[in-house]
């Protein structure tokens, strides 16, 4: 877990409600990513290391075959603040939340993409009709941001054991964080955003055809 301080015992119920998956303890299996998340432009950070026993815990893996990128996006729409002032975006949000909603709050742990600033903008472009579903899926892999591992329940917190920490120097790791974000944005505009393909699936088609989660075009 990347932070600006050492966290030996995370507090259940503490955090920002408008994070990707709501209140929870956000972790990664990649220590370098944790260092990037922990630093700021003017302060060092820490990669807090833990281990967790997952037996008996309910894990919602949004990358499992039974889910689509729209399931992930719907959870994001429920928690993050999107600009849905445009009619298409408002209609898209309503349809996705009615059709692709998951009971994610009952899970002990959620595994899925992390929506850093650039990735959040990709999702916003999709619900506004600027990019296709294929482009959204490709864009989420740009910059190799990876997955986040989010503890949601008290039971999950009780299974967490602190192992130690590594210090992250701001001068080194903030530069890497900024470069990753810039790379993702550059690749997005160079490779994805303006490269429409015939047959691409846009949010307008998903709405018009009232597509459901089991539609093979979403796999």
Residue ranges and their predicted role:
Residues 1-20, 40:
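ADP-ribose/NAD+-binding catalytic cleft of ART/PARP-like enzymes
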Residues 16-41:
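Extended catalytic/binding region for NAD+/ADP-ribose chemistry, centered on the ART fold
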Residues 9-10, 15, 24, 55, ...:
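Surface-exposed loop/turn and secondary-structure junction residues enriched for glycine/proline
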Residues 41-45, 54-219:
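Conserved NAD+-utilizing ADP-ribose enzyme module
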Residues 1-3, 27-29, 50:
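Short His-Asn-centered micro-motif
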Residues 11, 16, 25, 29, ...:
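Solvent-exposed, flexible loop/coil residues
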